[in-house]
Amino acid sequence: MRFPLRLTADLTMARLAQKLRLRRGARPIQFVDAAEILHPDSSHPVSHEKIRDIIGSRSPVLWIGGSEPLHHPGIAHLVRAITQSGHFVFLETTGTFLRRRIHEFQPVSRLFLTVRLESGAPHRASSGLRPGASELAVEGIRAARLSGFLICVHVRLAPETEMSDAAKLFHLAHSLDVDGCVISRACGESNSALPAAQALSQKTAEARKRIGSIWWESLSRLVEPVLLREPRSQPPTGTSAVHLEHEARADEEGIKFA
């Protein structure tokens, strides 16, 4: 799977700035709930001030999710404004309405249409369909690929998810020739009983190794706490410049594998 060099550089710089505390309050990735920004029945935003705050965000990546963003008439305008401001956008959707609304978006290098796949999710039976993905989502992915869009799949794992089910989703993603894959724990599972939470974390880490890209693995780790709304972790006060330089060099080494 491919990982944009520009995104690699932006995330590396954001992580270094965060560890050096040059950008207080900023994360490499910021979550945006479409329902808090856009009206469900109008293309106008709820607040122009909120739009300005989002566009002015110091986070290089904005992840738009929440209740289905494609339900909002103004989502394409919001995405266009954010990408034009220099941010990368991951627009998460179930994919059900993707084919219907794909014509409203522009296939730019800073936009990843991100289709969420969950094992065990209801879907119509079809001989050409793998478990965990609806036919409409698959059709949407194919239509987006043909239109030149970058596609990422977001695989969410729950405690009951079997690795065999997750493997089928990975196989589906590769068969559709997607550009990237993010794997995270399902929302709401971070507060499970400790043994269950540890088992899920271990299962998620194991699944990420199957992505085949250290950069998409890294992005998965960065995205997960943002999606789960976990508190931001702060670097140790004793973090040295030498240690940060070593991490930066390790990041640079990883570029050649992207």
Predicted regions and their residues:
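Canonical radical SAM enzyme core domain
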Residues: S43-I51, S67-S109, L117-P122, R130-L136, ...
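N-terminal pre-triad scaffold of radical SAM enzymes
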Residues: A17-R52, P60-G65, A241-A248, A258
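Hydrophobic residues within beta-strands of alpha/beta enzymes
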Residues: L62, F90-L91, L113, G180-S184
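Alpha-helical membrane-targeting segments
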Residues: M1-R27
